[in-house]
Curated annotation (Swiss-Prot):
<dbReference type="Pfam" id="PF05255">
    <property type="entry name" value="UPF0220"/>
</dbReference>
<feature type="transmembrane region" description="Helical">
    <location>
        <begin position="26"/>
        <end position="46"/>
    </location>
</feature>
<feature type="transmembrane region" description="Helical">
    <location>
        <begin position="56"/>
        <end position="76"/>
    </location>
</feature>
<comment type="similarity">
    <text>Belongs to the UPF0220 family.</text>
</comment>
<dbReference type="GO" id="GO:0032511">
    <property type="term" value="P:late endosome to vacuole transport via multivesicular body sorting pathway"/>
</dbReference>
<keyword id="KW-0496">Mitochondrion</keyword>
<keyword id="KW-0926">Vacuole</keyword>
<feature type="glycosylation site" description="N-linked (GlcNAc...) asparagine">
    <location>
        <position position="52"/>
    </location>
</feature>
<dbReference type="GO" id="GO:0005768">
    <property type="term" value="C:endosome"/>
</dbReference>
<keyword id="KW-0597">Phosphoprotein</keyword>
<keyword id="KW-0813">Transport</keyword>
<feature type="transmembrane region" description="Helical">
    <location>
        <begin position="150"/>
        <end position="170"/>
    </location>
</feature>
<comment type="function">
    <text>Involved in vacuolar protein sorting.</text>
</comment>
<feature type="transmembrane region" description="Helical">
    <location>
        <begin position="115"/>
        <end position="135"/>
    </location>
</feature>
<protein>
    <recommendedName>
        <fullName>Vacuolar protein sorting-associated protein 68</fullName>
    </recommendedName>
</protein>
<keyword id="KW-0472">Membrane</keyword>
<keyword id="KW-0007">Acetylation</keyword>
Length: 184
């Protein structure tokens, strides 16, 4: 038996990618989803500006959910998973701890708070685009495709950005077999 062969429960006719390959693929998939979401929204903006024959156009109100989703993506993906678990893994940390454990717990609390605000911006961006679709297009009876398509593109763009954020978060924080967490 060679050194590269390892015993596994199942045999597949293909090679399973390593965690490094999965991480790289996840980052690329996330970028593709963000680019797709941006292009879908930009398509609606350009259609509204140059080809739209109706009296409804994409305004700054339509941009606000997109900007919230983008800002939420930046905030969520700037937090490391290790920061979230920092206070729980320290041996000195606790409700009445002092010293380094208390500092770790404080940093973990701050990271969780910032992460909450990031996810709140993402959820607000998606729900805001749905509200814009309902109030601006459906309530005012603009339910024909080219005009309604601007609102649908806004929602689809925000969904793609949300999925991009989730894929990037998972890809960045996946544990591979060669990473070690040393705590003293």
């Amino acid at each position: 038996m060679e050194a590269d062969d390892h015993v596994s429960l199942f045999r597949f006719p293909f090679k399973i990618p390593t965690f490094r390959g999965i991480r790289k693929g996840g980052v690329y998939l996330s970028g593709a989803l963000y680019a797709l979401g941006f292009w879908i929204f930009l398509d609606a903006v350009l259609y509204s500006r140059y080809s739209n024959a109706s009296d409804v156009h994409v305004t700054f109100i339509d941009w606000i959910p997109f900007l919230c989703s983008t800002l939420g993506t930046l905030i969520v993906n700037s937090i490391e998973k290790n920061r979230l678990l920092q206070g729980a893994l320290s041996s000195d940390g606790g409700a009445f701890g002092s010293g380094v454990g208390d500092l770790d717990s404080s940093m973990a609390w701050q990271a969780r708070t910032v992460l909450f605000f990031g996810f709140a911006l993402l959820a607000g961006g998606l729900s805001g685009s749905i509200v814009v679709l309902i109030i601006k297009f459906l309530v005012k009876d603009y339910n024909t495709y080219p005009t309604l398509g601007m609102g649908v593109n806004n929602v689809l763009g925000n969904v793609c950005i949300l999925l991009s954020c989730v894929v990037l978060w998972i890809a960045q924080n996946v544990e591979d077999e060669y990473s070690y967490s040393l705590t003293l």
